[in-house]
Amino acid sequence: MFAYFRGKLTSVLPEEVVVEVSGIAYQFLISAATHRQLPEQGSEVFLFSHLVVREDLLQLYGFSGEEERQLFRLLLLTTGVGPKLALALLSGLSVQDIHDAILTNTPERLYGITGVGKKTAARIILELRDKVLKLSPVSALASPARLSSTLLRDDAVNALVTLGFSRIIVQKAVVAILEQNPGLTVEEVIKAALVSIHNS
């Protein structure tokens, strides 16, 4: 129904924003990934959108990129996955990480996201593999650089989890750090993540 919205960013919370378009304020639920891409409050913002319609609810979801919205819609096709869980996945992992987990049949990469257990992770991979492959066939052949980055991220996450930190908190911190500084070593990522977690 709505492809996208462009307007003034009037309110910003960790999981939702309000965008004013022609005098009408629209509330969007967003992922942590989209939150990181937002401009300053009061600036113009562009969000791709998805409208969830239920008997007692009309809820808009906003995305900084088309790929994220596309994956959100695919996740909703999975048995047992609703908007809340789909958004949690997109907050805890990058679009590419979820694609890689699906295409390489590694459900353990999805563990740790609130609400995602072994059965749910297995269903996501089983039900979405062909759909993700059609969307991005090149992703099936992960480049050495991307594989290296994925292994580095997993090593950093696993190391921090062994120190007693929550996997979902660690994943969010590590993903954010690698997005900003993709050239870091595992040790540097761990140190930066520890600082980020303690400061949050």
Curated annotation (Swiss-Prot):
InterPro entries attached to this UniProt entry: DNA_helicase_Holl-junc_RuvA_I, Hlx-hairpin-Hlx_DNA-bd_motif, NA-bd_OB-fold, RuvA, RuvA_2-like, RuvA_C, RuvA_C_sf
NCBIfam families on file: ruvA (TIGR00084)
Keyword DNA-binding: yes
Residue ranges of the region described as Domain II: 65-143
GO biological process: DNA recombination; DNA repair
Region Flexible linker: start-end pairs: 144-154
Physiological role: The RuvA-RuvB-RuvC complex processes Holliday junction (HJ) DNA during genetic recombination and DNA repair, while the RuvA-RuvB complex plays an important role in the rescue of blocked DNA replication forks via replication fork reversal (RFR). RuvA specifically binds to HJ cruciform DNA, conferring on it an open structure. The RuvB hexamer acts as an ATP-dependent pump, pulling dsDNA into and through the RuvAB complex. HJ branch migration allows RuvC to scan DNA until it finds its consensus sequence, where it cleaves and resolves the cruciform DNA.
Gene Ontology molecular function: ATP binding; four-way junction DNA binding; four-way junction helicase activity
Family according to the record: Belongs to the RuvA family.
Superkingdom, taxonomy of origin: Bacteria
Taxonomic source organism: Pelodictyon phaeoclathratiforme (strain DSM 5477 / BU-1)
Residue ranges of the region described as Domain III: 154-200
Keyword Membrane tagged: no
Matches recorded under Gene3D superfamilies: 5' to 3' exonuclease, C-terminal subdomain, DNA helicase RuvA subunit, C-terminal domain, Nucleic acid-binding proteins
Lineage of the organism: Bacteria, Pseudomonadati, Chlorobiota, Chlorobiia, Chlorobiales
Pfam families in the cross-refs: HHH_5, RuvA_C, RuvA_N
Name used for this protein in its record: Holliday junction branch migration complex subunit RuvA
Record's comment describing the protein's domains: Has three domains with a flexible linker between the domains II and III and assumes an 'L' shape. Domain III is highly mobile and contacts RuvB.
